[in-house]
Amino acid sequence: RGLGDVYKRQTKNFHDMELKELALERAKTWLSDQYDEQTRQQVQQMIDQDSDELVDAFYKDLEFGTGGMRGIMGVGTNRMNRYTIGAATQGLADYLKEQFPGKPISVVIGCDVRHNSDTFSRMCAEVLSANGIKAYLFDGFRPTPEISFAIRYLHAQSGIIITASHNPPKYNGYKAYWDDGSQVVPPHDTGIIDRVAKVHVGDIRFTPDEQLIETIGPEVDRAFVEAAVEHGSC
């Protein structure tokens, strides 16, 4: 092996050290009182163990892109959890209030059967309601087409689907929909992305207004089936 191989190894080691230091500094911010006790304990344990998991969980932010976001569930800035989902929903709420100033806003929320999908859905409803936005929350798991239908049926301005499609079980995801029942497209996609990027943990409104959270289910189920039959989809 020549000097080139030695240089490559040294460069990689240096890069790995930089990532580790970056991840450690970012992880330490999650030990503040802005995060719940269980999260702080999990982060401290990761720091104490000095594991590769710490680097992967904190070296970057979980990206919210045109297709929403998708990632491994767990604590960290690069994971699906209460705070990354909270930030995404707060950003969506901020954007909706910009787009529909002074008007009543509602959002339909549904999920698939993945681990934590129902918990994450509830989190979305709580953040939206805390922002004065009505949340229509399905009473259980539903297929994506029905959630898309419900957005139009209930005349909502947006929708959220908690799903990671074909990814392995440790993943989950977050997809934003617009009032036409389809995933957000320009200019709304970039508008939401920009708003989400500006959200800090202290900006997230977690305290729900239960009066703005409405459970939906059988009525929408029936309307969905009837519409599918009427239009020849069944």
Question: What do the PLM-derived regions correspond to, one by one?
Answer:
Residues T89-V107, H231-C234:
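Glycine-rich phosphate/diphosphate-binding loops that line cofactor/substrate pockets in enzymes
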Residues E63-R79, K103-V108, E126-A130, V199-E219, ...:
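Gly-rich Lys/Arg/Thr-decorated short loops/hinges at beta-loop-alpha junctions or inter-strand turns
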Residues M80-Q90, N116-S117, D139, P143, ...:
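Phosphate/oxyanion-binding active-site loops and adjacent basic polyanion-contact surfaces
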Residues F14-A87, R195-G202:
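Cofactor-/ligand-binding subdomain signature composed of acidic, glycine-rich
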Residues L19, W30-L31, G102-D179:
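Ferredoxin-reductase
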Residues W30, Q34, E53-F58, L62, ...:
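Gly/Ser/Thr-enriched, mixed-charge loops and adjacent short helices
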Residues R1-Y7:
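Short, small-residue-biased leader/transition segments that mark boundaries at the very start
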